[in-house]
Amino acid sequence: MPPSKARRKRSLRDITATVATGTVANSKPGSSSTNEGKQQDKKKEGPQEPDIPPLPPVVVNIVPRQGLGCEVVEGLLVPSRKREYKPNSKYTVGNHPIYAIGFNFIDMRYYDVFAIASCNSVIIYRCLENGGFGLLQNYVDEDKDESFYTLSWTIDQVDSSPLLVAAGSNRIIRVINCATEKLDKSLVGHGGSIHEIRTHASKPSLIISASKDESIRLWNVHTGICILVFAGAGGHRHDVLSVDFHPTEVGIFASCGMDNTVKIWSMKEFWIYVEKSYSWTGHPSKFPTRNIQFPVLTAAVHSDYVDCTRWLGDFILSKSVKNAVLLWEPKPDKRRPGEGSVDVLQKYPVPKCSLWFMKFSCDFYSNQMAIGNNKGEIYVWEVQSSPPVLIDRLCNQECKSPIRQTAVSFDGSTILGAADDGAIWRWDEVDPAASSSKPDQAAAPAAGVGAGAGADADADA
């Protein structure tokens, strides 16, 4: 039997007290009674997606110098110093690898909040202006043998509370309500370890999960329903390691895995089941889950494990264990489902990056990409330029452990690295004041959230 709730090991209540109330998540100070009435009206009307700030469209116009179908444009390993970063702080969580780290881009009220997954713990921090980290909440799963590999932020569609979804080796997806500091629900269905979870940007109740059982599952976090399963004759033939929703095409996503392929899937013909999942009142096991066996396109762009993939407009970024990230354009054959061609456009070299399960990340606007390597270095690329431009190479003499995953802040002014030795490394832009792309402060949390004197976690320079 899975544990009924996640045990909260430690919490700074002077930091999280406001987070746990409806004041920050749902209302302005002093208007709780009004909002309570509104919430009751919403419940009567039925659940709907929360009104969250929309993601801007990613504008990409990359034209290789050699032209399509010709030699791939490869970036030079010469830092341009367009943005210079300095190592700021180190925070050691323990001696276990940190497999996942991510900022909250779903809810702009918490744009400076990030979470990590290590061992059987999921820990939430805030990036402080002084360069340190503020510990907000720490959840420890009751299963001591659990090892979390992935996490993703989402939001409650009823009261807009921040939710954190995490999963790993024990095959169960945990949905944690960060406002109530309790486990909201557990999603069961996968037959193997879960390697990645992604949240739909415009429909945050929808998440997809990639598993060792060779399947991808689409879930409705609000109702706890497994809507669709993507596996079968045309599916992956080994562990699925990464997934990502298309930024503008609602029913499209990409997946990749140990079978060396990247697959593009469509759920448009089954969208009626997605809509049905929002109003389902029966037991989740009674929902008519559908299986999709054939992708729109299967691309053999790499010759080894593909452990990370992300959309860049209509293009795809994907990484294997061959010391590089590739940018390519998928061209599905509309007359022959599952077939088509690809044009590999650009190559972003990442020296000494031969380990698998090392993932890259981008800022909110997908302007820059950060990827770690085996030696504790992070390469920061200007991802939308052609030819690719290396912005900076981040290193620290003390950081020698592989960087499993990176997290780039909203505007790219802060870059975090999660290391194999249990350390979080932070680099900050030398002149962050020059950046003008931070989210509107009117959308930020009310004063006092994470701003208390006890918020500054001990950090080593």
Curated annotation (Swiss-Prot):
Tissue expr: Specifically expressed in kernel starting from 6 days after pollination.
Alphabetical GO biological process terms: heterochromatin formation; negative regulation of transcription by RNA polymerase II
Assigned GO CC terms: ESC/E(Z) complex
Keyword Transcription in annotation: yes
UniProt keyword terms in alphabetical order: Chromatin regulator, Developmental protein, Nucleus, Repeat, Repressor, Transcription, Transcription regulation, WD repeat
Biased composition (Basic and acidic residues): 38-47
Feature: compositional bias, Low complexity: 432-448
Segments for region (Disordered): 1-56, 429-461
Comp. bias intervals (Polar residues): 18-37
Protein location: Nucleus
WD repeat intervals: 143-186, 189-229, 235-275, 301-338, 351-391, 398-437
Biased composition (Basic residues): 1-11
Family: Belongs to the WD repeat ESC family.
Protein name: Polycomb group protein FIE1
Organism: Zea mays
